[in-house]
Every structure is written in C-alpha cells, then in structure tokens.
Design a protein with these regions (language model features):
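A cross-kingdom feature strongest in bacterial/archaeal respiratory oxidoreductases
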Residues: 2-8, 13
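Compact, glycine-rich, soluble single-domain proteins
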Residues: 7, 16-18, 22-99, 114
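Short coil/loop residues immediately preceding or within conserved phosphate-binding loops
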Residues: 12, 43, 105
Length: 119
C-alpha cells in the first residue's frame, strides 16, 4: 500500500554564514547562485542546522539583494542562533510516494570555505 513520506530534497552541507541581522524580517537570505546551486525555491521552508553551535531552526528562503556572491544572511529571531562564520547545513524536504523512496536521490552539495561547491 502506497502512502506519502517526507524525504530530503536538497541540501548545502558545511556552508558558512556570512551575515546575521537581528533587526530584519525573519528568514535566511541566499545569494542567487546559492539558491540555484541548492535547487531551492523562493519562500521554500528550509531547515538550518548550525554545526558550530549545535542548534536547529526552521525558516524560509529569500533572495539576498546585495551583490556579494556566496552570501548566507540569517535574519530576524533566527539571527540569535547563527553568527557570521558559523558552519551550517541548509536542508529542504519533499513529499513523495513511498513506492518511489528506494530510488529517490536527494541533491547534496558539499561546500568550500568560501561557499562555493567542492569539486
């Protein structure tokens, strides 16, 4: 019998927070190339797991409006849980039919220190 299950859709692993703005509308703002690299969508729910601090939170993705590449800007209340330089995992999930789970392949990108993809 088939049913829906939640699976890892995509993640950026070992990325680095570049900014944390407490006095800002909540979310995590990513530079456009990171949104594309992670196969994320605007306003998509994202889990932010802070490797440095050992904390986890859930927020949503928005596009960073500056010119800097490799930007991960944690905003609002979430900025109390992430500091510039912290290593993080950004993960999104999807609902799929359980019969497809064994063949599911999440999109996983391991990051360099400068928030580019490791080769």
């Amino acid at each position: 019998m088939s049913h829906s299950i939640t699976v890892l859709k995509s993640k950026l692993h070992n990325a680095k927070v570049t900014h944390a703005l407490k006095d800002y509308e909540g979310s995590v703002a990513l530079s456009p190339e990171l949104i594309k690299l992670g196969k994320f969508s605007m306003h998509e729910q994202v889990h932010l797991w802070n490797i440095t601090q050992g904390t986890r939170l859930i927020t949503y993705i928005m596009e960073y409006d500056g010119d800097e590449k490799g930007t991960i800007c944690v905003n609002g209340a979430a900025a109390h849980r992430a500091n510039p330089g912290d290593r993080v995992i950004l993960a999104t999930f999807a609902e799929i039919d359980s019969e497809k789970a064994d063949n599911w392949e999440p999109h996983i990108v391991i990051m360099n220190e400068d928030n580019t993809q490791k080769k």
